[in-house]
Amino acid sequence: GVCGACHRMGTTTFALQLVKYLQLKGYKACYVEVNATGFVEQHERTFNTVHDTYLGKVTFENVEMYYKQEKLLDVLKQEYDYFVYDFGTYMDTDFSKTSFLEKDVRIFVVGSKASEMSYTNELIRNEYYTDVNYVFNFISEKEKPELLEYMEEKAAQTYFTVSTPDQFEYVPNEAFEKLLPVEDISEPEEEPRGFFRKKKGKKKRGK
């Protein structure tokens, strides 16, 4: 499960990148919206997508996204290896702490800007969340050592995002390998064949 410390933290982008990472590793993964942002439905109205109105599934750029929380039991019956849940933000009134903590992997997307730090600090100091991971978004290289020092004993659970201009285009990030160290079961891509056959060279006669 992925959750942001506050709004506009890049939580949804990070969740979608996790889906793309798992797909790259050869697994069937999907995105599940468990918040009130309406992101998935907005995508369906704006872009050329495939829409399953019964399950509330929108497919875009090879990512299957679900938005009907009342259909969650039906969604869980689908043949996926991984479900990536986007819980929106920690400050939302409908955020479910219990549901978030029940997930196998728990990730808080946090920030270091002045407008974000109070929310980030609240999460870090909250004893309710101990076995969770923290991912700082929009961080410069200069800030990273300072933030790791600031995180103290939680530094080992702290990671950083990389610049991701397009939510649906995977950008390699070593943090994913540590957060979800899964075996790569993807099949190697076949080398494209040329249109023409290579001519066999003539054997040279010895003198």
Where are these regions (language model features)?
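NTP-binding/hydrolysis catalytic cores, primarily Walker-type P-loop NTPases
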Residues: 168-207
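Conserved catalytic-core segment of NTP-binding enzymes
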Residues: 78-82, 87-172
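Generic hydrophobic alpha-helical segments
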Residues: 69-73, 120-123, 171-179
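Active-site signature of alpha/beta-hydrolase-fold catalytic machinery across serine-
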Residues: 17, 21
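Hydrophobic positions on the alpha1 helix immediately C-terminal to the Walker A/P-loop
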Residues: 14
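Generic hydrophobic, helix-prone segments enriched in Leu/Val/Ile
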Residues: 43, 65, 147, 175-180
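Glycine-rich loops and low-complexity Gly/Arg-rich segments
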Residues: 25-27, 54-58, 108-110, 131-135, ...
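P-loop/Walker-type NTP enzyme "switch/lid" segment
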Residues: 1-9, 24, 28-94, 98-102, ...
